[in-house]
Amino acid sequence: MLTEKEAEQKLRELAEEFRSLMKQHQYVKAKQRYETARSVAVTMELSEDIREELFGVRGGKGEILRKGAFPEELVQRAFYEASVRKT
């Protein structure tokens, strides 16, 4: 079983894979990387600092205060392309 630090590193690697897959227009695979990272972060109850590093920070009105390793605009595009366009 992975330690918390090892899991954090794996999640950072998933973020790198996500960005690489987006550049290659592999939207379904990119979406899967994001969903896996999100599920693991929630299941492991990672610290808020790590979740913010990975997924960013939003303000009270929904504005993006800090971008994460999974940039929201790319996540939205991956979901759109994978779900609507089914590429």
Segments the model singles out, each with a brief description of its role:
Residues R33-V57:
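Short, charge-rich amphipathic alpha-helical segments embedded
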Residues R85-T87:
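Short acidic DE-rich linear segments
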